[in-house]
């Protein structure tokens, strides 16, 4: 699908950058010769816009071998960022998709500045081509045919092999994010814990990873009372899923991902209202993020050791479901007083974190659609983070900045730990109250990470979008897939 050439040839469409202060760039001047000065006229009359994310289409009318040029406005160079580029190109690829373009090229060097080199642009272009044109997988009987972009050529003077490699990495990042989106969008009667485990096993086998899928009996033997409590009311068996990627000869410096895999959350006996229950099929967004990251890792084969652990079940109401006031014993041996059955994700993650440590994780990153509180605090575009290790957090933060997935750190204070430990009947309680809800959830998880370097990512606000945007349709976003994979790719770099 991806090609690299030094000269422009025949294409259905070509994408060209337009900066506010460089309306007469060498690229535009060269094209303007073929248009006999008409491009400059269009610029002067503001028919070609340099505003951020403005897309201006110009037909060549046979003056060149290219049928249509799409000029992408990027604003001023001083405010040009990777986020600007991602949004602008995402919108552009959506436009090409709507026009049913099958052969497109990009004048890569027209997007290059002192801040962004050709490799950066190539990676982002290939990545957002997949993200921007992703379509919701539906179960409608009337399926419409979809015209795909079949050929995408980067026109550049830079080294072809390096650009091809960047295009490949970007494509892999975009495709894996879309895999996660598809998982999150699946209905809960289709994506059960069993089906999620089957998906994970297929992924592991495809990329020659080791894997384990613990059944209920094995969980009982290991004392995973927290996950088992959440599963008590369900007819669907729970699964503790582990994928093991060995990128080094020795099993050291192991990065452990733990993804919340609650395939549907009614709230249990702490029942959600109807409005709060619709959409809870997406409560396994953390599991999807982890699996998407493992897809990238499987494709790119970084020299790191990684395990991905997913505690999975649904949380439903029945005569056997766990209840407020229950006291349960986690795999760690710590006892937990249940004050809220709708705070089930942290219970599943507690055993997931302990199991990841048992498998050898030296660093922990958990990902979960954990609290509504994080949405109140940070909105729908920023993931909440908590940590017990600033060095590890800085690496996660740097990865998120590279992928333009916004993260903001929330605190853990001793007084928060005291609230989580406040129980007359157990070591911990699972829900001290609504105040500081996102912080309470993360603080609870820190009790199981203990001294292992750990970062918690609450994607409740970022996992799904209520409306269409430049990088995709309404629905699942695939939040943190690219950040987790980038963390692994860059881990330990100075």
Swiss-Prot record:
PROSITE patterns: CYTOSOL_AP. It catalyses: Release of an N-terminal amino acid, Xaa-|-Yaa-, in which Xaa is preferably Leu, but may be other amino acids including Pro although not Arg or Lys, and Yaa may be Pro. Amino acid amides and methyl esters are also readily hydrolyzed, but rates on arylamides are exceedingly low; Release of an N-terminal amino acid, preferentially leucine, but not glutamic or aspartic acids. Pfam families: Peptidase_M17, Peptidase_M17_N. It is found in: Cytoplasm. Its cofactor is Mn(2+). Mn(2+) 1 binds at residues 265, 342, 344. SUPFAM superfamilies: Macro domain-like, Zn-dependent exopeptidases. It comes from the Bacteria. Its EC number is 3.4.11.1, 3.4.11.10. Binds 2 manganese ions per subunit. Mn(2+) 2 binds at residues 260, 265, 283, 344. GO terms for molecular function: manganese ion binding; metalloaminopeptidase activity. Signal peptide: none annotated. One of its GO terms (cellular component) is cytoplasm. InterPro entries: Leucine_aapep/pepB, Macro_dom-like, Peptidase_M17_C, Peptidase_M17_leu_NH2_pept, Peptidase_M17_N. NCBIfam families: PRK00913.1-2, PRK00913.1-4, PRK00913.3-5. Belongs to the peptidase M17 family. This is Probable cytosol aminopeptidase. It comes from Bacillus cereus (strain AH187). The gene is pepA.
